[in-house]
């Protein structure tokens, strides 16, 4: 009998004003799930930046396979955030070394571009370690990219808010204007 393979899937950066939306996909076996839970894995939003960074090498080492996908700010503006998020998720899944039988997707976003089985799970990172692991990988990868972009655009304070719509970020956009990495469709009420 063929083993049933499930991939956890989560997105990061959906509500940001700057930069791409990222998605992580992770396939774990039961032993890897237990090991990650013992190491403190949970929803990336409930972990410190240091804890997330420390978990990444372990996730990559013991997962059956993992991948990250993204959609650019330009794609978000052209396609809308829903479709761009779906594209990032599909890209992550297609980059997996093994294609899963089912996707376990955090939230309520059904993937129209995926023709296999899928299950959306509200608060999925609290229920499925593979979703939590995908969340951590995507969050660390996106934050690292945005922090590198902070060096190119220091006036926006990106290292502090990683592109989200804080008062500091909104004030910087009002003062300095938008960059090519800002999501134009998200800025209509700021400029």
Curated annotation (Swiss-Prot):
It is an enzyme of class 3 (hydrolase). A divalent metal cation binds at residues 10-11, 106. Manganese or magnesium. Binds 1 divalent metal ion per monomer in the absence of substrate. May bind a second metal ion after substrate binding. It catalyses: Endonucleolytic cleavage to 5'-phosphomonoester. One of its GO terms (molecular function) is RNA binding. Pfam families: RNase_HII. It comes from the Bacteria. GO terms for biological process: DNA replication, removal of RNA primer; mismatch repair. GO terms for cellular component: cytoplasm; ribonuclease H2 complex. Its EC number is 3.1.26.4. InterPro entries: RNase_HII, RNase_HII/HIII, RNase_HII/HIII_dom, RNaseH-like_sf, RNaseH_sf. Its cofactor is Mn(2+); Mg(2+). Its main location: cytoplasm. It is found in: Cytoplasm. Residues 4-191 form the RNase H type-2 domain. Keywords: Cytoplasm, Endonuclease, Hydrolase, Manganese, Metal-binding, Nuclease. Belongs to the RNase HII family. Endonuclease that specifically degrades the RNA of RNA-DNA hybrids. This is Ribonuclease HII.
């Amino acid at each position: 009998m063929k083993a049933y393979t499930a991939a956890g899937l989560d997105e990061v950066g959906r509500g940001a004003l700057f930069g791409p939306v990222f998605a992580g996909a992770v396939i774990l076996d039961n032993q890897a799930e237990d090991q990650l839970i013992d190491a403190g894995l949970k929803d990336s939003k409930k972990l410190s930046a240091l804890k997330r960074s420390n978990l990444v090498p372990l996730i990559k080492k013991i997962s059956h396979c993992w991948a990250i996908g993204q959609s650019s700010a330009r794609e978000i503006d052209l396609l809308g955030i829903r479709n761009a998020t779906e594209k990032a998720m599909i890209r992550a899944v297609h980059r997996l070394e093994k294609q899963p039988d089912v996707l376990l997707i955090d939230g309520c976003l059904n993937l129209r571009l995926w023709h296999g089985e899928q299950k959306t799970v509200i608060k999925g990172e609290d229920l499925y370690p593979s979703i939590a692991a995908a969340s951590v990988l995507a969050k660390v990868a996106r934050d690292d990219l945005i922090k590198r972009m902070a060096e190119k655009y220091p006036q926006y304070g990106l290292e502090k808010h990683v592109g989200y719509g804080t008062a500091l970020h909104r004030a910087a956009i009002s003062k300095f204007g938008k960059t090519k990495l800002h999501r134009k469709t998200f800025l209509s009420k700021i400029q």
